[in-house]
Amino acid sequence: MEAKAVARFVRMSPRKVRLVADEIRGYAVGEALDILKFTNKRAIEPLTKVILSASANASVLNDKVDSNQLFIKKIYVDEGPIMKRFRPRARGRAARIRKRLSHITVVLSD
C-alpha cells in the first residue's frame, strides 16, 4: 500500500530542499523524522510536514497500518514557478531577483 502527500509552492529553493531530501530517502518514517530533528537546515520544516501528512494519509487509507512500518519509498523535489522581483541598483539600474518555489512529493510504502 502506498500513501502520497504533496506540498506545493513552498517558498524555498529546490536545490536547498533536495540536500535534505536526499538524506532521508529510503528510511523509515520515525527514523527520518529523527534525522530531520537533528538537521540544522531551514528545509526540515516543510519536509517534516509533508512526511507527517503522508503518514496520516496512510492511516486514512488503511486503519490497520502501523506508522512505524512505513518507509519513504520516493521523495522528490521539483521546481515551482519563479517569482521575479527587482532590486534598485546604482545609476538608475535594477537587478532581477529570482525567488524560487518548490513542489515536494513524498510517497510512503509498507
Curated annotation (Swiss-Prot):
Superkingdom of origin: Bacteria
PROSITE patterns: RIBOSOMAL_L22 (PS00464)
Keywords in alphabetical order: Ribonucleoprotein, Ribosomal protein, RNA-binding, rRNA-binding
One GO BP annotation of this record: translation
UniProt key word DNA damage: no
Entry's Gene Ontology molecular function annotations: rRNA binding; structural constituent of ribosome
Pfam family, one: Ribosomal_L22
Database matches in Gene3D superfamilies: Ribosomal protein L22/L17
A GO cellular component annotation in the UniProt record: cytosolic large ribosomal subunit
Function noted in UniProt: This protein binds specifically to 23S rRNA; its binding is stimulated by other ribosomal proteins, e.g. L4, L17, and L20. It is important during the early stages of 50S assembly. It makes multiple contacts with different domains of the 23S rRNA in the assembled 50S subunit and ribosome.
Subunit structure: Part of the 50S ribosomal subunit.
Family recorded in the similarity comment: Belongs to the universal ribosomal protein uL22 family.
The protein's name in its UniProt record: Large ribosomal subunit protein uL22
Species name: Leptospira borgpetersenii serovar Hardjo-bovis (strain JB197)
Gene behind this protein: rplV
